Amino acid sequence: MKLKEIDRTAMQAWSPAQNHPIYLATGTSAQQLDATFSTNASLEIFELDLSDPSLDMKSCATFSSSHRYHKLIWGPHKMDSKGDVSGVLIAGGENGNIILYDPSKIIAGDKEVVIAQKDKHTGPVRALDVNIFQTNLVASGANESEIYIWDLNNFATPMTPGAKTQPPEDISCIAWNRQVQHILASASPSGRATVWDLRKNEPIIKVSDHSNRMHCSGLAWHPDVATQMVLASEDDRLPVVQMWDLRFASSPLRVLENHARGILAIAWSMADPELLLSCGKDAKILCSNPNTGEVLYELPTNTQWCFDIQWCPRNPAVLSAASFDGRIRVYSIMGGSIDGLRQKQVDKLSSSFGNLDPFGTGQPLPPLQIPQQTSQHSIVLPLKKPPKWIRRPVGASFSFGGKLVTFENVTGQPQQGAEQPRRQPVFISQVVTEKDFLSRSEQLQHVVQSQGFISYCQKKIDASQTDFEKNVWSFLKVNFEEDSRGKYLELLGYRREDLGEKIALALNRVDGSDVALKDSDRVAQSDGEESPAEEGQLLGERIKEEKQECDFLPSAGGGTFNISVSGDIDGLITRALLTGNFESAVDLCLHDNRMADAIILAIAGGQELLAQTQKKYFAKSQSKITRLITAVVMKNWKEIVESCDLKNWREALAAVLTYAKPDEFSALCDLLGARLESEGDSLLRTQACLCYICAGNVERLVACWTKAQDGSNPLSLQDLIEKVVILRKAVQLTQALDTNTVGALLAEKMSQYANLLAAQGSIAAALAFLPDNTNQPDIVQLRDRLCRAQGRSVPGQESSRSSYEGQPLPKGGPGPLAGHPQVSRVQSQQYYPQVRIAPTVTTWSDRTPTALPSHPPAACPSDTQGGNPPPPGFIMHGNVVPNSPAPLPTSPGHMHSQPPPYPQPQPYQPAQQYSLGTGGSAVYRPQQPVAPPASKRYPNAPYVSPVASYSGQPHMYTAQPASSPTSSSAPLPPPPSSGASFQHGGPGAPPSSSAYALPPGTTGTPPAASELPASQRTGPQNGWNDPPALNRVPKKKKLPENFMPPVPITSPIMNPGGDPQPQGLQQQPSASGPRSSHASFPQPHLAGGQPFHGIQQPLAQTGMPPSFSKPNTEGAPGAPIGNTIQHVQALPTEKITKKPIPDEHLILKTTFEDLIQRCLSSATDPQTKRKLDDASKRLECLYDKLRDQTLSPTIISGLHSIARSIETRNYSEGLTVHTHIVSTSNFSETSAFMPVLKVVLSQASKLGV
C-alpha cells in the first residue's frame, strides 16, 4: 500500500535505525533528467510522518549541490544515544568523488554541510556500503575494478581489499557481510561476484554463473547466515535472483524466476530473512521468500520502472522505491485501506475550486463524487504470512507507568545437556510520547519546590497568546504581591493616580495626586470599613483643604439672629428642634425636599435616625448613581453583585474589591462569577474565571475553565493544572485555608493528570499531584498502583497478614522463638482421629512436636477474664468454649536442666476436627512428615511447649525457656501400656513400630481410602525396620507448616514396655466434669522413648544413662518388637492437599490419562495391563512437576506437541517428538516420566486405540 510520494528523480537513503523521527534523504540522480530538463542538483531531507494521511512528505531542508549522485547512503557513524539527527550522509558522485555530508547541519540550514570529499576513484562511484560492525568503515566501488575501504575517522588515505581483479571491469554493487565484519563482496555487470577477506587482503572465492548471461545489478548478504548471498541479473534473457551458498559454490542454491524482465535492484530485510525485495523492468515490485521462492507480496505500482529500492531501517514494514518517472514512493507491506486517501484527494480538489461558478451558469458546482466502480479495490491486502517481527513467539504489551514489555524469538542453538534452559530476554522500555507535557510538568514541580511563583507567573504572562490568558496569569500573580486588592483594581482599569488626575481636572485643580494619595491611604487603612468618626474626620479634611469661605456655624460674635416659631415649615422645624424632637424635624425637612438639612439633623439625632433618613432619601432620589450610593452607604454589596448589568461586571468587581469585608469578599466574588457563567454570553463566561481567582475558589475555577476550554489533549490539561496549583498555593499563603480538601471535579482532573504523568513514566510526580484526602475508588486504586510501582506501602493501609507479627502476645503466653521464622499462613481444615498433636510449625513458632491426650487441657492463663481476643486476621475454626478451667500462670524455670512437667500455653491456635477410627490396627505410614493441629471442638486449646532433652544434654532450641512445675486441676490419664510415637520418613519410609491405642468405648469411622497415602492403599506393607524403597530422586522441599521431626526408629527398643506411672501423681483426685471419662486414655510418647512430660512426667529423670540422652535415628536390624503393636491403632496419615495443575497444562493430564484408559480397555494381556497401571502411577511425577512449574519451556512445549499427536492418533509423530525432547533436554528433568510416556505411546500404537 502506498503511503507517501515525492516528486523527485533522485537517489534515496533512509536515516539509521537509531534516528527518530524517520528521515529520507534524496540526492539528484546522475545521468537522468526530469520533465523540466533542469541541470541543477540538490540534496534534500524529508520527514516521514505516518500520522498524516496525505501523500505529501514534509521537506525539512534542501541543500543546493554541484554534484549529481549515483549512490547515496546514510551511515550511523558518531550517532549519539539520544537519537537526534546525526550520522553521516555518504554520496558517490559521477566524477569519481565521494562526499561526506552532515545531515544535522543540512536540517539546521547551515551552509557548511560538507564534512570531507575525495576524488580518488576513476569514473562514477556506483557502489557504497557501511560496515554494520564498525560504522566508520565504508566500502566504495567504481570503474577499473577499483575498490576502496574508507575510514571516516581518517578520510585522507583509503585502503584496498587486495589486488584488482583481472580483467578490469566496473564494480556495480558492493556489500559487507552481515555476520562477519571482515568479509566484503563485490559484483560487476559481467556476472562475476568476488568475496574478499580483509584480514588476508585477497579474494577468497569468486562466484559466477556458467551461462555467462548473468549481468549483476544487485548483491545482498543473508542477514543471518554468513555464507549465503543473492545476486540479481538485469539481463532480460535471464531475469533471475540467484541464491548462493559459499560452502557449495559450484551452482546456485536456489533460483527465483518471478520477474519477466531484467531485475534492476534488490533489498534483503534485516528484520526478516524471509523477505527479499526486487524490482525490475517489468514494472513490478515483488516481495519473495528466498528460501522457498514464493512471492509473498506484489506492490501495486504503475507502469514505470524502479531503479532503486530500500527497506526502512527503523520501521521494518516500510520501504521506498525510486522510479524513472521522477517519483519516490513509500509503501507498506502491511496493507490497508485507501478510501481515506481518495476522499482526501477529492476534498483537496473540491476545496481548490470551492462552490464557484467557473462556467457562468449561475449554479454552484455539485460536490465531486468518487466513482463507484473503484470501491472494490479500496482494500490492499498485506503479506501472505506475518513477518518475523510480529510472528510468534513475539509479543508486546503496555504496562502501568508507560512501560512497554516486549519479547522476541532470539535465535541461538540450545546447549546440549545444560542444567539451565536457554534464557529468553524480555525487554522493558519506557515509552514517552508527550515530551512537551513532561517538560512543563517538571517546570511546575520545580516552581512549587523553589516557591518562585511571581517569576513563573510573569513568564506565563510574557508567553501568553491571548488577552484572556494574560489576564488570568496577571490575576494569579497579584495573589503573591502586596496590596493585592489595589493591584486587582489596576488590572480592572482603576488606577488611583489616573482617578486623582481626572477629579482634579473636574474641580479645576492642577494637581490631583494628593487627593488620590489620601484616598489610597484611607482605603488601605480602613480595609473596606469606615467608622462614622473616620467619615467625619475625612469630611473635615476635605472642607479644610478646599478652604470653603462659608461657615456652617457662624460664631456668636457675628450678630444676632431671629428664631422663628411661626406656623410655616420653618417654624415647625424650629419648635421640633427646641423640644429635641429630631425625628419630626427630619420628617419636615424631607417633606419640604430639604434633603441636606434632613441628613444634617439626622446625624445629630443618632445612628438609628440617620439610617432611617438615608433610606428615605434613597427612596426619593432618582439619579443614575443612586443605587451605587445606596449600596456604598448601606454597605449592601450583595445588591451590586446581584442587580448590576453584567456588562458592568468589572465595576461590580471593583466595588467588591474596594469595600467588601474579608469574611464576605470570597462569597461576593463567587456570586458574581456564577452570574457571569449562568447569564452571560460565551465571552462573559470566560471572565468568570477572574472572579473565581479573586475569590480563591479552586473548584469553581476548574469547572469554569473546563466549560470554556478544550481539555481533550494533555497540554490543555497541563494549562489547567498550572493555574490550579498556583491558585491553591496563593490561597494557602494569603487566606490560610485548608487546601487539602478537594472537590469531586478537581479530584477527577488531578486524577487524570496523575494518570498522564504515570503513563509517561513520572511515577513520583504523579503520586505528588494525586489528592490525598479523597475516597473515590478510581483515585484510591491509582494511589495504590503508584505506591506499588514505587515499592512503597500505601499510606493509611496496612498489608493484610494472617500471622501474629506485630500483635501483642497475651500475658503468660510464650513468644515466638528467637531466630526462627514465623509462618503467616493458617492451616487448612482437615480431618484426623481424635488425638491432639502439637504442630511443629505454627503461626507463632517452630517447635518440637509434642503428643497430647485427646481431652482438652486447661485454657491459657490470662490477666483478664474471658481471655484475650484473637489478633486481627486470625481465623477461628469451631466454637469457643468459654468456661475452660484455667491453671496458674507459668513462670520461667531452669533453662533446660530438667524437662518441663506441664505444657507452656500457646493461645489462639486454630483448631480442627478429627474423626475417630474403628476396628483393626491401622498403621500410620505417611509419605510426607505431617502432624495434625489441635481439635476443633476446643479452639482455645493452647499449644504445648517443646519437651526438653535429658539432663546434661543441650536442648535443640536453646532460646526456648522451660517452665517451672505448677499444680493443675485438670484430670490426669493413666500411664500407657506401651510406647507410642510417630515414625517419620521420606517417600517410602518404613511404618511406625507403635501407635496410639484407642480408649475403650470409642467409636468412629475410618478415613476413606482416597484420603490415605498410596502406601496404605496398594501393595503389601514393609516391616517396620525394612529399608525405604527409593522410587524417585528425592529433592529438598520446604518444610510444611505442620512438620514434625522424626521419632527415632529405636523408640520401641529403648522402651519396649512403656514407662511406669509416676507414683507422685497417682493419688491425685480427678476433677469433676465430663473429662473424667477420659482417665483411661493412654499417654503418648515422645522421641527416643521419652514419655510425655506435659502432665505425668516426674520433675527429673536422674537415672537415665547419658548414652540414651541423644536418640539414635538409625534402625537396629533384627530388634524385637514384642507386643508393642498389640491393641493399638495408629493415626491415619494427613491428606496432603496438592496444588492444582495450571489450566494451560491440564490438557496434558487429561490426554495422557484418557490414552491409558483407552489402552487398558483394549489390552488383553495381563502384563500389558500391569505396565499401563504402573505408567499411570509413575506419571504422577510429571503432574507434580507441572504443579510446581519446574519443567523448562522446551520440555513443556514438547509435551504439548505429544498431546496434540495423541489427539490426532499420530503416535509415530509423538514418538519422534519424544526422542527429540530426550535428546535435547536435561536427563535429570525427564528421567522420571519420559520412559513411562514412551511405553504408553508404544502400547497405544501397538493396540491401535
UniProtKB/Swiss-Prot annotation:
Residues 796-805, 1013-1024 have a biased composition (Polar residues). Ubiquitously expressed. Monoubiquitinated by the BCR(KLHL12) E3 ubiquitin ligase complex, leading to regulate the size of COPII coats. Residues 161-470 are annotated as: Interaction with SEC13. Gene3D superfamilies: 1.25.40.1030, Functional domain of the splicing factor Prp18 (1.20.940.10), YVTN repeat-like/Quinoprotein amine dehydrogenase (2.130.10.10). One of its GO terms (cellular component) is vesicle coat. Residues 961-970, 991-1007, 1056-1074 have a biased composition (Low complexity). A motif (ALG-2-binding site motif-2 (ABS-2),) lies at residues 873-879. Pfam families: TPR_Sec16. WD repeats lie at residues 4-47, 64-111, 120-160, 166-206, 209-254, 258-298, 301-342, 397-429. Residues 790-829, 842-940, 954-1123 are annotated as: Disordered. One of its GO terms (biological process) is protein transport. The keyword Chaperone does not apply. It is a peripheral membrane protein. There is a cross-link at K647, K1246 (Glycyl lysine isopeptide (Lys-Gly) (interchain with G-Cter in ubiquitin)). The modification Phosphoserine is found at S526, S531, S799, S1192. The modification Phosphothreonine is found at T1190. The modification Asymmetric dimethylarginine is found at R423. Belongs to the WD repeat SEC31 family. Component of the coat protein complex II (COPII) which promotes the formation of transport vesicles from the endoplasmic reticulum (ER). The coat has two main functions, the physical deformation of the endoplasmic reticulum membrane into vesicles and the selection of cargo molecules. The ALG-2-binding site motif-2 (ABS-2) contains a PXPGF sequence that binds hydrophobic pocket 3 of PDCD6. This is Protein transport protein Sec31A. It comes from Rattus norvegicus. The lineage of its organism: Eukaryota, Metazoa, Chordata, Craniata, Vertebrata. The gene is Sec31a.
